Amino acid sequence: MEEVSSCSLRSTLFQQEEQNRITYRIPALLYIPPTHTFLAFAEMRTSSRDEDAVYLVFRRGVMKGCSVEWGPQQPLMEATLPGHRTMSPCPVWEKNTGRVYLFFICVQGHVSERWQLLWGRNAARLCFLYSEDSGCSWGEVKDLTEEVVGSEMKHWATFAVGPGHGIQLQSGRLLIPAYAYLISCWFLCFPCSVKPHSLMFYSDDLGVTWHCGKFIKPQVTGECQVAEVPGKAGNLVLYCSARTPNKFRAEAFSTDSGDCFQKPTLNQQLCEPRGGCQGSVVSTRPLKMPYTCQDSSGKDVPSTQKCPLMDRSLEVEEGAGAPSGTWLLYSHPTNKKKRMNLGIYYNQNPLEVNYWSRPWILNRGPSGYSDLAVVEGQGLFACLFECGERHEDEKIDFCLFSDQEVLSCDDCTSPSSN
């Protein structure tokens, strides 16, 4: 077993193999509290291109004190369909049964996303399998495409889940973030308007049956993640952070557990590089709580300041810094032009648009997709992320870090330019 010890710990879990061009991309990370186990997933590809994905690989890590012992890399051959490549891992832990559900898409052969968008012919299947022993063994794959999407698929040019973790709400609902390219009109045999929109797949019966939520509109949104945060008088609100091509991150809120979202808004504190990039978000209850926050001019921001993103039903209680001490933690490249310098941001008042901190830089240099996990009750977080010396697809690293390190950037002004 490979051991990573003490805090702010870093280890390479998946390394590009230069001789045979094997590349690992699209990280997904899950922490399972009862067994103190991490599951780290990635796509194995024969090149960096999306259409050269083959199957998923994973590693199991066990927390021992403030260290993680990692087992060997394993191919997840159970997560395959004949004649398809497996992509976009999205795991979620169901606390009542102890099952780990792993969602993914299986895409026909080497059919590219561009081809699907050009012809309006979806080549992806919505699939999942589950483990009842924290990833030691896996069941058979199940194709949910017809059951969950059905006839609506004729309006989808293509789609994907995640990538990165899903969540279970306090109500028990399981949520798998996703996005689809919607075809709004055709000209002869070609779709003339195809735009991506985020949505949720969900289950209210512990994963027995699954359903499709409504699209986040009208803003173009893609790869996304969600986190549950407190709203008014115990009302729980779902926060969604979504990729856009429009220079800034899109944020949207749901008051019905992810079936429907309000109109998304671009947050100008959270930049996107050219073309956008996937990012990760989690909710957490930090062990250390600062009492004030500053705006961009350096003045204290009142804790009761209302967020222009939300309607009156989402307002937090009077006097709340975060009403129950729940924060958001967000990982994303911080450079406005390129996928560089992976940052960790926090928001101590999740429904307030102006409360995002400056980023604490987790990785300097090329940085791509990432996925966050919370080690509950220990003030620790984990991040699985793409990085490298020259390109962000050279390796996928795991880092364990503390809330104290994130809070070292303890003001809430806008991120500086990169």
From Swiss-Prot:
| Family that this chain belongs to | Belongs to the glycosyl hydrolase 33 family.
The UniProt entry annotates the motif FRIP motif at: 24-27
GO-annotated molecular function: alpha-sialidase activity; exo-alpha-sialidase activity
Q: How is it modified after translation?
A: Palmitoylated; may regulate intracellular trafficking and anchorage to plasma membrane and endomembranes.
Enumerate the UniProt keywords alphabetically: Carbohydrate metabolism, Cell membrane, Endosome, Glycosidase, Hydrolase, Lipid degradation, Lipid metabolism, Lipoprotein, Lysosome, Membrane, Repeat
Under InterPro entries, the record lists: Sialidase, Sialidase_fam, Sialidase_sf
Write out the ranges of the repeats annotated as BNR.
Answer: 129-140, 201-212, 252-263
Pfam families to which the protein is assigned, alphabetical: BNR_2
Q: What does this protein do?
A: Exo-alpha-sialidase that catalyzes the hydrolytic cleavage of the terminal sialic acid (N-acetylneuraminic acid, Neu5Ac) of a glycan moiety in the catabolism of glycolipids, glycoproteins and oligosacharides. Displays high catalytic efficiency for gangliosides including alpha-(2->3)-sialylated GD1a and GM3 and alpha-(2->8)-sialylated GD3. Plays a role in the regulation of transmembrane signaling through the modulation of ganglioside content of the lipid bilayer and by direct interaction with signaling receptors, such as EGFR.
Q: What is its EC number?
A: 3.2.1.18
Q: Where in the cell is it found?
A: Cell membrane; Membrane, Caveola; Early endosome membrane; Recycling endosome membrane
Catalysed conversion reaction: Hydrolysis of alpha-(2->3)-, alpha-(2->6)-, alpha-(2->8)- glycosidic linkages of terminal sialic acid residues in oligosaccharides, glycoproteins, glycolipids, colominic acid and synthetic substrates; a ganglioside GD1a + H2O = a ganglioside GM1 + N-acetylneuraminate; a ganglioside GD1a (d18:1(4E)) + H2O = a ganglioside GM1 (d18:1(4E)) + N-acetylneuraminate; a ganglioside GD1b + H2O = a ganglioside GM1 + N-acetylneuraminate
Tissue expression as described in the entry: Expressed in brain, cardiac muscle and weakly in liver.
Keyword Cell membrane attached: yes
Q: Give start-end of the signal peptide.
A: none
Q: Which organism is it from?
A: Rattus norvegicus (Rat)
Q: Which GO terms describe its cellular component?
A: caveola; cytoplasm; early endosome membrane; external side of plasma membrane; lysosomal membrane; lysosome; membrane; plasma membrane
Which residues act catalytically here? D50 (proton acceptor), Y369 (nucleophile), E386
Tell me the residue numbers annotated for binding substrate.
Answer: R25, R45, Y179, Y181, E223, R243, R339
Membrane topology according to the record: Peripheral membrane protein
Q: How does it assemble?
A: Interacts with CAV1; this interaction enhances NEU3 sialidase activity within caveola. Interacts with EGFR; this interaction mediates desialylation of EGFR enhancing downstream signaling.
What is the designated name of this protein? Sialidase-3
Query: For this chain's UniProt record, which GO biological process terms are given?
Result: carbohydrate metabolic process; ganglioside catabolic process; negative regulation of clathrin-dependent endocytosis; oligosaccharide catabolic process; positive regulation of epidermal growth factor receptor signaling pathway
